[in-house]
Amino acid sequence: MNSSDPYRIPGLELIDHAFEAPLDYLDPRGRQIDLFVREVRDLDPKSSEKPFLVFLQGGPGFRAPIPIQKTGWLKRALTEYRVLMYDTRGNGLSTSVDHQTLGLEGDAAAQAEYLTHFRQDNIVRDAELIRSKLSPGMPWSTIGQ
């Protein structure tokens, strides 16, 4: 896991976290992919003690929103949580899948096999990997659209 230094935008503190995860959890030492999560906190000095709330973008194919201000549901969530904006595998700053990257995987059969690793079951496994690094042994909550 690699984490950025905290940085601020008006009313918010952000920390970017990068992780490596197996492309195929049945072969954990094989090919790895990148996962990206942005931690969003309010400016309360005790915010680092709050539990995590993971935001799951409704997708498919969309990155997590980039917070630019503390309004709406995010404002409410930050009263109780640190929010993780999770770019699921295949999207955003995580290893992405698009027509260009898919073309690098070979023929149609190889491309289809590659895409089998970008389903919800692996997105959940990735989330658990992230949880094990950011808050080992602690539960977290989820929200999505």
Which residues fall in each region the model found?
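Gly/Pro-rich cap/lid or specificity-loop segments adjacent to the active site
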Residues: N2-Q145
